[in-house]
Amino acid sequence: NLVRTVFGNWGVVGQPGSKGPRGAWINDNNGYIGDVSPIIGVEVSANDTSGNPLTFHSVVVTPADRPNLGGFEESPTGKFWGFEPVSGYLNETQERVAISTDPNTWPPYWPDKLNESDDSGWSGKWNGYFGKDIQNIQQESYFLMDDNNDEEFNHSQYNNLGVAFHPDSLNLSRNGLGLKMAVRGMQWQQFLAQDCIFWVYEVKNESTTDYKKAVFGMLVGTYIGVTSTEDRGEYDDDWSFFDVNDDITYTGDFDNDVSRNPKWDGDVGMVGYAFLESPGNPFDGIDNDGDYQELEGAPFAPLFEESNFDSTLINVGQIVILIDSDYLRTEYTIPDLDTVEVITGGEKILIIPGETYLSEGNPIELSNNIEGANINAFDGIDNDLDGLIDENYFLHYRQRRVDQNGTILFDIINPRAYIDYISGLGIDNPLIDEARDDNIDNDGDWDMEYDDIGADGIPDTQDIGENDGQPTHGEPNFDETDVDESDQIGLTSFDYFTPAGDYPMKHDEQLWEKLKPGFFDTPSSIQNGVPIAGEDGDFIYGSGFFPLRAGQTERFSVALVYGKDLEGLIN
């Protein structure tokens, strides 16, 4: 593999710069990144200390050593508020992250495997993505982080909202949002994979709180030409952009000249950050990833039409769909009353039969004569009582992206499939609202001949599920081991900022706005998709919204990929 990088078990790739190459390709002195790290944002409904209900946003960051606006995310006493490593996942007598090729880095046992009845803790065995001691990945690293240190909204004296939010009603000492993130880095030497590192993130909501709206993001500090911790100024002529169709963001050096770094060897090239798996939404009734026809013989499902986004008059006797807190749908017939109050998704909707019109995600005029979707397409509620949550004209029918200046980035008619909860069409299609924890082989690719090898993922060990003729968790091509069993959302936001210090690390609401779906802030140095200048700029990209319920795990994976030019990068 041609990629080398330093990283830490606090979630930052490319740091500390003094410890090794910083996202280097081909040559260890050919560094491409200053810092790359995950971000998780969540909308929280809670009460302040006076009992008044309110909604706020908490965005959990990593301790990236980088310029920012207003200082680091930390307490008044200097305690970092964000993701920090979970202990027990490396050999504490040395400093390296646990890595598959070096047993000396492994812990005495793996805390997340203590409940394995046949081999508690997997002592002396690698905790692999594909199962116990399976090392068919050339090199694999593994660590865990959680947000227990992020106490900003757990104690009212730390925030200006007067909030003392406790995410876990069963453990009031649990701080943050109750999130834990497992992180794996993966590399292969094969020709097709030699120019990338794969990063796999699993975020679990360990709290007792259901979050209706969450968003995943990545912060990318660009620095083509970096070697270690020196400051040769090579960060001031980079350019960055994105391709929503291919779910990739990328960075190049404008003049293709990094001669200020005398250690650089060879051509400059480019670096990209590609979603291989984005978070999924298995609750909205919509085929977000457009794969509803990929299973042979899959039941019919309707496609969105323009008329689906017209306002609908609600009349007496009309059947509507109500959604409970577990996302179960029930039919409800509008009674012959002057006013009718219904509850869906925990929200009250008042209806005057024969007068009330309902709509969701319909086109409206936003500021500066820019047309966009009704803001109710982003609230996690079924506002028009059709059983679909947050349908969006500009996402699920006419897929259009517009930047902050009103420039259309692309605009195509590409309707998504959905479930018609009144007629029942689409409800039996396993590739609409598929999930990696629904106990279903949604895409039908589990093969009894090859995959029926048991929960440990290893053949011929006679463990649970082996040769029982049905899929078992831990076996290949089923639920958590099958990326395709997720109704993926893809790239939904991109925020470019310059200078690189314009990163509001400690300002949760500002970060939330940058991560919101539909926010595409493109650099002025890009015209018609082509760079006209280089500068010192970094970016944040996001994928959301999706529900993150208590006990739920969402997965996403990113490839840090390199190429000589944009075509080579994408290919």
Where are these regions (language model features)?
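A long-range scaffold signal marking pre-active-site subdomains of enzyme folds
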Residues: 1-571
